[in-house]
Every structure is written in structure tokens, then in C-alpha cells.
């Protein structure tokens, strides 16, 4: 592993180091917290992200999310960090990372690397849908208890009960809806290098630019 102090001595600027950093492999330590853990690996030479494999999964009902354990912790030199992204194959699922992009402070964090996913058809979504459909049933004067009438397919009552059944099924069998299973590659890790930053408060006006204060959507669609 290359100490950052040596980098600063060898190169005058951070950008100068970036130009040659790929020529020198960087050692990142990974510790297996479980014998079944799989070390991160590149699927192809030239890949940016290393595939991360789940060794177990648990469902957290309170937050309606699936927690995937990698069984790995890691250590890097100062000034290195890691991004956690979903894999491109995630598009085949209805899941997304809870924090969208994870950041591992691997120079100081020694805990397990986890991936937390939520399904777009979450419990809250299903519950909200059921409440809306129940309201529609109430407006139409239809009973909302299953035994009070024969449910006809395609009606508001039918949609309401389907939502209730879906909600109960997630509660009683959450793993059926897990986006990934044990042994799947659930995400990817990208190692990045970052410089020291000094925040400097200024009383002076910032330099003028062509863009100025134009914000969201200022360049058009």
C-alpha cells in the first residue's frame, strides 16, 4: 500500500498523481468475517466496479428493507474510499439501494459492508393503495368486509382485497419478494481517491462566470 505522504512528496499536485496512479496497483485489505464470504472481484479486465456477493439476507419489517451481508470488512490507506452501487442487472428487479449510493470510509470504518435494498412495491405503497381503494369502496357505498358481498373481478372491491392480500403476503413471507438471494452478486464497489480539502470562508465576492446563479434545468431539457 502506498502511503499518501509518499505520493505528496513524489508529485507536486494531486492531478499529477492521478495521471499515473493506474500504473501502480493499490492494495486494499479485505477481512472475511464469515468463511463463506467472497472477495470483491472484477468480472472483466478494465471494469470500474468490483462485484460484491451476498452471503445472507434478512428482512427488516420496520423499515421494509432487505439487508444483504457480504461478510467482509476492509481497510485502506488514508485518502481512499469506496462507493457502493447497484449492478447494471438491477434493472431486472423492482429494487433500489436505500441510500442510492453507499460510501465506505474504508480508512477508518471496520464494520461489515452491507447492501440495503427496498422494493418499489413496498409495504407502504401497498398499504397506501389499499387505503385509497377502501376509500373508493366507501364512496360507492360498497361494504369493505370480505364476507359482506361477493367480490367481482375488476371492481374497486376486488382491487382493494388484492392489495390487502399482497400486504399480508409480504408480512408473512417477505423473502418471496427479496430482489436477490444468498450467493447473488448484489452490487459493485468502486474504489476512489480523494484529496485533502480545506474549507476557506471568504468575505469577498466569488468570481463571475457565464452560468452565474442559474441552477436546476438552466441549460434546458
Can you annotate each of these PLM segments?
Residues 1-221:
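DUTPase catalytic domain/fold
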Amino acid at each position: 500500500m502506498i502511503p499518501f505522504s509518499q505520493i505528496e512528496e513524489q508529485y507536486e499536485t494531486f492531478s499529477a498523481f492521478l495521471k499515473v496512479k493506474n500504473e501502480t496497483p493499490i492494495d486494499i485489505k479485505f477481512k472475511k468475517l464469515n468463511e463463506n464470504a467472497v472477495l470483491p472481484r472484477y468480472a472483466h479486465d478494465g471494469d470500474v466496479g468490483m462485484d460484491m456477493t451476498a452471503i445472507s439476507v434478512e428482512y427488516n419489517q420496520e423499515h421494509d428493507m432487505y439487508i444483504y451481508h457480504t461478510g467482509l470488512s476492509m481497510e485502506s490507506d488514508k485518502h481512499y474510499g469506496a462507493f457502493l452501487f447497484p449492478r447494471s442487472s438491477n434493472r431486472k428487479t423492482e429494487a433500489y439501494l436505500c441510500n442510492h449510493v453507499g460510501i465506505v470510509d474504508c480508512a477508518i470504518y471496520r464494520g461489515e459492508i452491507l447492501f440495503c435494498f427496498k422494493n418499489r412495491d413496498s409495504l407502504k405503497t401497498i398499504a397506501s393503495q389499499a387505503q385509497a381503494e377502501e376509500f373508493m369502496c366507501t364512496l360507492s357505498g360498497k361494504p369493505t368486509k370480505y364476507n359482506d358481498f361477493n367480490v367481482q373481478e375488476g371492481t374497486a372491491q376486488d382491487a382493494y382485497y388484492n392489495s390487502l392480500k399482497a400486504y399480508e403476503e409480504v408480512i408473512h413471507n417477505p423473502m418471496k419478494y427479496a430482489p436477490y438471494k444468498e450467493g447473488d452478486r448484489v452490487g459493485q464497489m468502486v474504489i476512489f481517491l480523494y484529496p485533502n480539502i480545506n474549507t476557506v470562508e471568504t468575505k469577498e465576492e466569488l468570481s463571475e462566470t457565464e452560468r452565474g446563479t442559474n441552477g436546476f434545468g438552466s441549460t434546458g431539457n
